């Protein structure tokens, strides 16, 4: 317990927060071990990089850097409205979809409320919950995914928000659209359902829910998506939320002005219209997933079936130890003990060459433990 008087000034929820730990940066491992040619399969980034159209849009915007960006993101909202057939008034732009999760908590949740989510769910959910002083209600998982029946039972008069990621991170589990919509339709209208679809583009088309069409039926639904994953713009930090116009208006009241820089706005608009690059990204992910799963079969390892651009593999021993051994070989993956999965590692899908380097390194390590 820190007894410093300045520490005591912080809100109780902030004092108890465990900071989010991101995947290790390549530069950090270079500094620590003096390695080169490091590959990073830790943060579910796009191994093909951003769309060439996005890069061109950034270059065309550089001359205007002395100016403030459009604080309302007019052009990007218009592009999103056209692509997804929703009203611009239903769109909220965020500095990554993570900011939207924080805006939702700040807008709707206070210390007397509860926020419900699943075990093995994205680490930002407890962070934004604790930051506003609310109580996190963590529901046991079903086969590493969401148990919607258990979540229903966990909802009380104090529940204000339910977070559901589909696919879930870090497990990759996917809920069927009809099952998910049935759950949302049963929710009390006083409970906000946040459907986190950061990995939506990687879901096989036949399994993609028509979730945006639900917005007209469920005024308590918010859907968040991001440009960080399939669109390859993680370094620019931009995402968007879709909801009723009323919810969007409320979120925009607490959103910081100019929360999206002009490079991000221009790149996101261009990336949204580069269908060829998105298709290449999805195809690379499908092929890479198959490559990794074939490798796991060869090593007689189990994994959690994933609908995202990552897969969590069960090593049947300390994931942290294997993670550290991989670092020595210049391969960065993601330990997930903080998600109560101490024997798993989460592997982002890379290029064919990156995937093979990882599999070769893993095989060599497992041969000596």
What positions do the PLM features span?
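Phosphate-binding glycine-rich loop
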Residues: 66-114, 132
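Active-site pre-lysine segment of PLP-dependent enzymes
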Residues: 148-158, 170-193, 197-228
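Conserved PLP-binding catalytic core of the aspartate aminotransferase-like
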Residues: 286, 295-329
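N-terminal "arm"/small-domain region of PLP-dependent enzymes with the aminotransferase-like
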Residues: 2-67
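PLP-dependent aminotransferase class I/II
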Residues: 51, 72, 220-304
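PLP-dependent enzyme catalytic core of the Aspartate aminotransferase-like
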Residues: 325-329, 333-334, 338-369
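Short acidic capping loops at alpha-helix termini that bridge into adjacent secondary structure
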Residues: 37, 87-91, 111-114, 158, ...
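PLP-dependent aminotransferase-like
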Residues: 107-164
């Amino acid at each position: 317990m820190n007894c410093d008087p300045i520490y005591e000034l912080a809100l109780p929820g902030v004092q108890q927060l465990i900071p989010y730990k991101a995947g290790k940066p390549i530069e950090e491992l270079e500094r620590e071990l003096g390695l080169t040619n490091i590959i990073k399969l830790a943060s579910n980034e796009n191994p093909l990089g951003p769309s060439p159209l996005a890069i061109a849009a950034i270059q065309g915007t550089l001359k205007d850097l002395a100016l403030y960006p459009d604080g309302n993101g007019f052009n990007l909202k218009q592009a999103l409205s056209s692509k997804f057939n929703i009203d611009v008034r239903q769109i909220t732009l965020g500095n990554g979809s993570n900011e939207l999760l924080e805006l939702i908590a700040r807008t709707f949740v206070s210390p007397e409320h509860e926020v419900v989510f699943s075990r093995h769910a994205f680490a930002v959910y407890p962070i934004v919950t604790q930051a506003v002083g609310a109580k996190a209600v963590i529901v046991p998982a079903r086969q590493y995914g969401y148990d919607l029946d258990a979540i229903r039972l966990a909802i009380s008069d104090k529940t204000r928000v339910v977070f559901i990621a589909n696919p879930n991170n870090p497990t990759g589990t996917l809920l069927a659209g009809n099952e998910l919509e049935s759950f949302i339709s049963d929710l009390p209208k006083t409970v906000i359902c946040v459907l986190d679809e950061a990995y939506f583009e990687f879901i096989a088309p036949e399994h993609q829910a028509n979730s945006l069409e639900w917005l007209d039926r469920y005024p308590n639904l918010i859907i968040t998506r991001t440009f960080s994953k399939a669109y390859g713009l993680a370094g620019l930090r931009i995402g968007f939320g879709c909801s009723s116009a009323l919810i969007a208006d409320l979120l925009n009241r607490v959103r910081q002005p100019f929360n999206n820089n002009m490079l991000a706005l221009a790149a996101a608009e261009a990336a949204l219209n580069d269908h060829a690059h998105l298709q290449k990204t999805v195809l690379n992910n499908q092929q890479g997933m198959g490559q990794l799963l074939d490798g796991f079969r060869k090593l007689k390892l189990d994994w959690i079936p994933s609908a995202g651009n990552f897969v969590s593999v069960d090593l049947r021993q300390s994931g942290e130890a294997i993670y550290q051994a991989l670092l020595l070989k210049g391969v960065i993956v993601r330990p997930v003990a903080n998600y109560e999965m101490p024997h798993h590692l989460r592997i982002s899908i890379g290029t064919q060459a990156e995937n093979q380097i990882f599999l070769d390194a893993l095989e060599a390590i497992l041969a000596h433990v």
